[in-house]
Amino acid sequence: MHEMSLMESVIEIVCETARQNGATRVKSVRLDVGVLSHVNPDALIFCYEAVRHGTVADSATLEINRIAGEGWCLDCGKTVALEERFGACPDCGRHRVQMTAGDELKIRDMEVI
């Protein structure tokens, strides 16, 4: 389960950022997770519960925002919705689509005290 190492990194970044800004506690964390990122949100939540204990994020809430897949078709020049990572353009049917959203995992923001 790669979600555990991902969440360990998220907690490390969150705690270090809180310390650098003089915060004593993290109140909430919001993540953006792309639907095409191969990251399971339920597994992330499970791992979050496991790795936050004993840190300044011990009682922080976690919110996960799902980011839809989107791409730019190099053939028809349109921005299109993507349902799969290497799918065809839904407009022209060609497979020259450059992904522009939906594969990210990033910390959107956090609230500290």
From Swiss-Prot:
Gene3D superfamilies, sorted: 3.30.2320.80
PROSITE patterns the UniProt entry points to: HYPA
Binding site for Ni(2+): 2
Domain of life: Bacteria
Coiled-coil blocks: none
Assigned keywords, A-Z: Metal-binding, Nickel, Zinc
Gene Ontology MF: a single term: zinc ion binding
InterPro entries cross-referenced by the UniProt entry: Hydgase_Ni_incorp_HypA/HybF_CS, HypA/HybF
GO biological process: protein maturation; protein modification process
Binding annotation for Zn(2+): 73, 76, 89, 92
Function, as annotated: Involved in the maturation of [NiFe] hydrogenases. Required for nickel insertion into the metal center of the hydrogenase.
NCBIfam families (UniProt xref): hypA
PANTHER family: HYDROGENASE MATURATION FACTOR HYPA
Family to which this protein belongs: Belongs to the HypA/HybF family.
HAMAP family: HypA_HybF
Protein name: Hydrogenase maturation factor HypA
